[in-house]
Each structure stands twice: as C-alpha cells, then as structure tokens.
Amino acid sequence: MPCNRISLSAPARDVAGTYTCSVNPKTSQPTSATITPIGTGRHWLARLPPGLFAIVFGLLGLAGAWRRLSAFNLPLTEDISAAVLSLATGLLELLLVLWIIKFFRHRDEVKKDFAHPVNGALLSLLPLTVMLTVSLCLPSMPQYFQLASGLTLAALVLQGAIAWRVVSQLATGALPADMVTPALYLPPVGGGLIGAMALNALGLHGWAVLLFGMALGAWALLEARILNRLFAGALAPPLRPTIGVELAPAPVSMLVAATLWPDLPADVLLVGLGVSCGALVAVLARWRWWTAVPFSAGFWSFSFPLAALASVAVEAVRRGGWPVLVAYVAVLMVSAVIVYLAARTLLLLVRGRLLPPG
C-alpha cells in the first residue's frame, strides 16, 4: 500500500511540506505518516555554527604571517597584512553581533552548542579569535589597552569554561569515542597558546609564560587520546573537516615561543618545524578520507595551522639569516590555500549552503 493511502487529518492535508511514512518490514504496509511543513525549520540565525569563527581565525593568522614577512622590507607586504587584518576584524565584528543576537533570541540553541562534544569545542573559536585580534592589533593601537584588557579577560574566562567541560568529559569517560576529534585541542591547548600571545601583548609576560606551559601540558594529555582515535580509522564524515586542527599544536606552539622569546635561536624553530611536518604527513596520508566529503566551512580548520607554519618559517629565515625567498614562498603558498578556501566558501554562501540545513 503506498504511503499516500494513509489518511491524514484535514489540517495536515492542507499544509505544503515533506511527507514521510513508516513501513512495517514484515507486511510492507505503511504504519504512520508525518509531515514537515515548509517554512517551519529553524531560523537561519539559530543554525549559525560556531565553526564560522575559523574563517576569522585563519585570516588573522594570514595577516600575522604577512606582517612578519614585512620585516624584510618586501614591497606590498605591509599593505597586504593591513588589508587582510581589516577584513578579518570586520568579519569578526559581524559574527560577534550575530552570536550576541543568537544568544538572546535562540538561547536554547547556544546551550545545545555548548553541551555538544564537538560544537562545544568549536565554540572556543569565539574567544580565540578575540584574543588573537588583541595580540595583533594592540601593539599598533596602545590607546585601546583598557578595552583589550577587558576583552582578553572575558575571552579567557569563556575559554576556561569550555576547556573545563572538554577536559572533564575526557577525564571521566563521558565523551563518546566517536566524538573524539582534533577539535578537542582548541579549548585547552589553543586557549592557552593564543591566550599567552594576548597576555604578552598586554605586557604580562610572566602570566603569558605560565599559560604557555599549561597549554603544552594540555597538548600532552590530549595527544595520545586523539591520535589513538585517528589511528583507529576514519572519522564520521561530518567530523572529517576538523582533521585540520591536528596540524595546529606544533606550529602554533613554536609561533608563541617565538613571540614570547624574541631571541629564540633559529635552530629551536627548526625543531618545531620538524615536529610540524610529522603531523602534516599524517594528515596528508588520510587525504582520501577528508576529500571524500563535500566542501564545507569546516575545512577552514586547515587555515590557521598552515598560517602559523608559514609564520614560523618566516621567523626561522629571519633569525637564521637564510634566503628571504624561502619565507616569501611559504607565505605565498599559505595565501593560495586561504584564497581557495575563501572562494569555495563564497560559492557556498551564494548557493545558500553555508549554514547547516534546518
């Protein structure tokens, strides 16, 4: 018996939408029918994912790479850095406004994001982008010191709350095994590393070093658990774009170290680059897995780690006295990747596919 033979109530018959039915596997007879009316899905603001902050995060990282390259007095480097930084801060302001509105209009959705094993970790991108903006902008705009201090404090508190939830879930075995992804690095490891950069920009070097050490400790605690999951097989398709975060701990750690200790030798940075290459090879070895899923904004997870890798390469070249061309090529390659990500993201936006379905 076809599904349309099931009688629907008069109100249901008059509603345009998608009809589905349940079928008894033994008799092949439909047992029930439901209707999802058109236009009753979640509001687009309620579907705004925290992962969109990864776009800002990657652009900020790229701006930082070009700024470091400008130390070689290459043409246009300062202009490119300023342009990318302006784009990133403008987008950050837009997303912050949208998320504030979402918090007041769709608070239940925000609570769901916070409680979700993966979205909760990705939510840490919000304070991460704020702290990275502080570290990049404050040196050239010291008149905003008080504002930067307040933003950094608020971001660290939010970051700490998210990191506590992630660590407690892992420590108590409450996190489902299929939800273990590299995104879990973001709250405890990323928060400590980027927080250290922000505190250093505020002149709190000692606190920055302490936070840097806490981030390294969190990296050591999480590394075995996450690698064990990655070596066990492919992640679920929706989670595969988060694989880019696996690249982050080593290059970002070295970038922070180079920031905290300006006289750090180039050889130390080379060690960090070598460790970073190991993670890069491991991620590339799984390319069939993460390229088998459709493109989404989640692939911006690759952007900041690669930008950090380029920044460390620039610092190694500058401190080691090596050919400037090496640094220039590194930044250009990362710029090409981010331009590609931006083009694909704009295409999703035009097609109305940037946000998850309602």
Show which residues each predicted segment covers:
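Helix-coil boundary and interhelical linker segments in multi-pass alpha-helical membrane proteins
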Residues: W66-I80, C137-L147, G195-V209, A257-V268, ...
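Acidic, Ala/Val/Gly-enriched low-complexity intrinsically disordered segments
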Residues: A10-A16, V23
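Juxtamembrane helix-loop boundaries in multi-pass membrane proteins
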Residues: S32-A65, S81, L85, R107-L132, ...
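Transmembrane alpha-helix boundary signature
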Residues: W99-R107, S135-Q146, V166-A171
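Alpha-helical transmembrane segments in multipass membrane proteins, preferentially the mid-helix core
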Residues: I162-V166, A196-A198, L221-L230, V252-T259, ...
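Structural signature of hydrophobic alpha-helical transmembrane segments
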Residues: A83-L94, Q146-G160, G206-W219, D267-C277
